[in-house]
Each structure stands twice: as structure tokens, then as C-alpha cells.
Amino acid sequence: DNWLKTIQDSIQTKYPNALKQNIIKRNMMLLKDKPFASYYEQIEKAINRNDIVSINHRISAFMASYFDIIFAVNELLHPGEKRLDKYAKDNCQILPNKFEENINKLLVQPNSETLNILDDMVESLRQILYLGYHI
């Protein structure tokens, strides 16, 4: 029908330059350029206090902004949250130097024990819930 063609046509329009500039400016500020409380600064503070939950939370936010910038630079619509590195490699003509290497170094934590650890965490929660405690 017409509604599908309308959606397809709207997607085929040129990437708005103002949107591109705003995405880049806002997310660069969040990454490190903000005078205080940038993701970089928050990660640094979390590292100094050895707060691994906060480190991972802030790294996730950092990565979201990082990919927002990459897709804006390449004038691509954001594909969602899964396999962003592969999507970027396959579809972006402009990528940061050491793109894969830096991501792999940053996110090296997941390993063969990750699923076992998650299973243990869930089972521990179940034990608490089974005993009638509330989280």
C-alpha cells in the first residue's frame, strides 16, 4: 500500500546535516569534551574506587555515544543495539583508527566463565527469593 512507500521514501531522503552536527556535538561532549561528568571522567572515577558495576555501566553508555557518532559521521540511520561493531564494519566507510582493536581491548572481560558466573548469580538470587527475602 501507500503507507509502505511513504515510509520507504522518507528513509531514502538525505541525512539531515543539522541532525548529524547535533549528534556529533552532543555525544562528543558526553564522551570526554564535557567540562565535568563526561563518561570518561565517570569511568575514571569508577576505576579509582574499583567500582566494577559502575565501570561497566558507564562503558556501555560510552559505547552507545561512540556508535552514535560513527553512524552520524557516515550519515547512516542507527540500526539498533545488536552487533553494532559488525554493522559499522560492513556499512561505514569512515571508521576510527584501531576501531576493532580498541573495542576488543575495552571489552575483553567476557570470557568462557561469563555464562557460568551469570548462572551462579541468578541461582543465588533464586535462593534469596526462595527464602522469602525481597530484593
List each model region and its residues:
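Conserved NTP/Mg2+-binding pocket subregion across the NTase superfamily
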Residues: D1-I47
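Amphipathic alpha-helix face/heptad-repeat signature
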Residues: N27-K32, R58-I59, I117, M121
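Charged/polar positions within long, soluble alpha-helices
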Residues: N48, F67-H78, K82, Y130
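Small-residue-rich helix-loop
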Residues: R58-S65, K86-Y87
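Short, charged amphipathic alpha-helical segments flanked by flexible coils
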Residues: E75-N104
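Long, charge-rich low-complexity segments
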Residues: E101-I135
